[in-house]
Amino acid sequence: MPFRSNNPITRDELLSRFFPQFHPVTTFNSGLSGGSFLIEHQGQRFVVRQPHDPDAPQSAFLRQYRALSQLPASIAPKPHLYLRDWMVVDYLPGAVKTYLPDTNELAGLLYYLHQQPRFGWRITLLPLLELYWQQSDPARRTVGWLRMLKRLRKAREPRPLRLSPLHMDVHAGNLVHSASGLKLIDWEYAGDGDTALELAAVWVENTEQHRQLVNDYATRAKIYPAQLWRQVRRWFPWLLMLKAGWFEYRWRQTGDQQFIRLADDTWRQLLIKQ
């Protein structure tokens, strides 16, 4: 249920008002990230989530709640409460592994997701690329970065091959291997977009694995694999710029050195793939 309030509340207030019988599970963090934590009562478990990006507009967090409200429980956690800076969703039991599942199994999950009704809002990358440029450390902004940004702005985003609801953050840490099959968590970037964009954004280990995933998906979607792979490749420069910009943005936001290393590595990949 959505609960509208302009006044943020504390964690203790949230629990006492809405979940008075639940208590935090302090020793459990499998599959949790950011400010998330687990609460439990008589074997029933919920995940209490906060926005990963404290500077993001509240509307982005609300969209995540709406996306989860639309999705079937077979692929995503069901939400139970939304209010400013807080969301409570089902805990998904299962294993979160350090590597991707079999490509055919993952292709099946993504194809099933892409058959669901659209969310109602489009994923557009250019505004994000420009935001990350503007919000990055001025000392890190380079002529090459600006040149690539202008090039993409002029080229415009590839025309969608098929428009569907997307997760847009598919990696091993966001996949729960449950008894009933694969499920996805962390839907903060979800929206409608090109299915090839989703496939391009999967955090794969190598090109061979990526090609196999695309081939397995193409078989299910009845698309020529070569055609789908060409469309996936069209998105590569956009996604690498998105990743690099996000790492730069997070570096300025947090001061965490890991983001500088990740940004530098992504810039190198972008130069290789040009």
Swiss-Prot record:
GO terms for biological process: thiamine diphosphate biosynthetic process; thiamine metabolic process. Disulfide bonds: none annotated. It is an enzyme of class 2 (transferase). It holds the Pfam family APH. InterPro entries: Aminoglycoside_PTrfase (IPR002575), Kinase-like_dom_sf (IPR011009), Thiamine_kinase (IPR014093). It catalyses: thiamine + ATP = thiamine phosphate + ADP + H(+). Catalyzes the ATP-dependent phosphorylation of thiamine to thiamine phosphate. Is involved in thiamine salvage. Belongs to the thiamine kinase family. HAMAP family: Thiamine_kinase. This is Thiamine kinase. It comes from Shigella boydii serotype 4 (strain Sb227).
